[in-house]
Regions:
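N-terminal Rossmann-like FAD-binding beta1-loop-alpha1 element of flavoenzymes
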Residues: 1-27
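Glycine-rich FAD pyrophosphate-binding loop
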Residues: 20-40
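Active-site substrate-recognition segment that forms the wall
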Residues: 42-45, 50, 54-92, 220-227, ...
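Rossmann-like flavin
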Residues: 85-204
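Flavin (FAD/FMN) cofactor-binding core of flavoprotein oxidoreductases
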Residues: 137, 141-142, 165-173, 265-266, ...
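A conserved short coil-to-beta-strand element within the FAD-binding core of flavoproteins
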Residues: 166-173, 191, 214-228
């Protein structure tokens, strides 16, 4: 039996892929599938344009500028600065390896929408994915110059874009009372209409194909010969393989295997506007406001902010309040929100995911650290883990995602 630990979008997709191949699977999480962590509250954007890792020489200046901006989108509590500095040092180092890291990340991201589309069709839920692209808008002075620069950057990466339609731009400009506007359309991107339903669909399909879905708070993994003991607060389950997919909580489970993992919890926030009519039927990224708005079933969801407050800090109420003010300024009906959410994204300093095997314990595998694009990469990751379990060579190669890169 294979224990998949963590029932977020990565773990549930992995369990689904393994079960569809006829393997005995145990999907374990302390919460119901998709109801905790970043999988519940993400923007729903299938971000196949994000071929480059975030760290870059130019981003180093932008990172600190955003950090010090009044009500800016990036926040690190003062008390966490000492603990955060080692991660930040590695982030800065990775900035000068961006080109090499793009070579590893881009082949994994580029086919991600097709892979997710195929997987959702295989489980009978193609309705969850909408392939209408997404829009990127600039509303401040210099909007046309910045849109043109972004189009050139995307062309170098072979990411297709087109100018946003004039009627859409006029609608967004009037809603925000802006004097200038420019925008791009990314036709190859997509979005899901309900991220939680995607996770539930993966978990339900796994269960329909024989997987057991159980609620346990896994505390540790112990090797016993060729078996793995999954130790929870209530019992111990013996399995042949374990796959760690616990997102921002993964480092602690892997520590006993000699892996010191520089994993941070970059918390994101969302608010929802129930019953709101979208400006268009596809997601919009407002670049100047660092705000994403996605049409979902029965509501609009808006996401923003990156808060390195750690796993245990309470949510910062200033962030949803600021997001609400931003949405009102952009012309959205954000006076009566459906509530706010905060969840931790698992982020490694080079912004590459961690996918592979524990070197000295090959029946312990891991798949986490997908930063902002876990939903995007869920199907690709599931396929890759299924290949690793079956001793098939994954395509594309994920050798660069091995955790030994941090040794």
């Amino acid at each position: 039996m294979i224990a998949v630990i963590g029932a977020g979008v990565i773990g549930s997709a992995v369990a689904c892929a393994l079960a569809l191949e006829g393997r005995r699977v145990l999907l374990i999480d302390r919460d119901a599938p998709g109801e905790a962590g970043a999988s519940f509250g993400n923007a729903g954007h299938i971000a196949t344009e994000l071929l480059e890792p975030l760290p870059s020489p130019g981003m180093l200046f932008g990172f600190w500028r955003l950090l010090t901006a009044f009500e800016g989108p990036l926040h690190i509590p003062v008390r966490r600065v000492p603990a955060f500095l080692p991660w930040a040092t590695r982030f800065a180092s990775a900035a000068f390896r961006r080109e090499a890291n793009t070579v590893h990340l881009a082949p994994f991201v580029r086919p991600a929408a097709d892979a997710l589309d195929s997987m959702l069709r295989d489980i009978g839920r193609p309705d969850l994915l909408q392939r209408r692209g997404h829009y990127e808008l600039w509303l401040n002075r210099g909007a046309h110059r910045r849109a043109a620069a972004q189009a050139r950057a995307m062309e170098k990466l072979e990411v297709p874009t087109a100018p946003a339609p004039a009627d859409l731009l006029d609608t967004a400009r009037r809603a925000a009372r802006a004097n200038e506007i420019a925008g791009l359309w990314y036709p190859k991107c997509a979005h899901v209409v309900d991220p939680l339903e995607v996770v539930r669909a993966f978990a339900a399909t796994a269960a329909q194909h024989g997987a057991s879905v159980v609620r346990r708070n896994v505390r540790s993994l112990v090797t016993r010969g060729e078996s793995i003991e999954v130790v929870s607060g209530t019992d111990t389950i013996v399995v042949s393989h374990a796959v760690i997919c616990t997102g921002a909580w993964s480092a602690e489970l892997l520590r006993p295997f000699g892996l010191a993992i520089p994993l941070e919890a970059a918390r994101g926030y969302h608010v929802e506007m129930p019953g709101a009519i979208p400006l268009i039927d596809a997601p919009i990224l407002y670049q100047d406001q660092n705000t994403f708005v996605t049409p979902m079933t029965g509501r609009l969801r808006s996401t923003s902010f990156m808060d390195f407050g750690g796993l245990d800090s309470p949510a910062d109420p200033r962030h949803p309040a600021q997001l609400r003010r931003t949405l009102i300024a952009l012309g959205y009906p954000a006076d009566a929100l459906q509530g706010s959410w905060v969840g931790p994204r698992p982020v490694l300093p080079d912004y590459l995911p961690a996918i592979g095997r524990v070197a000295d314990t090959p029946n312990v595998l891991y798949a986490f650290g997908h930063q902002h694009i876990g939903l995007t990469l869920s199907a690709m990751t599931a396929r890759t883990v299924a290949d690793l379990v079956a001793a098939r060579a994954p395509a594309p190669s994920v050798a660069a995602f091995d955790l030994r890169r941090f040794s």
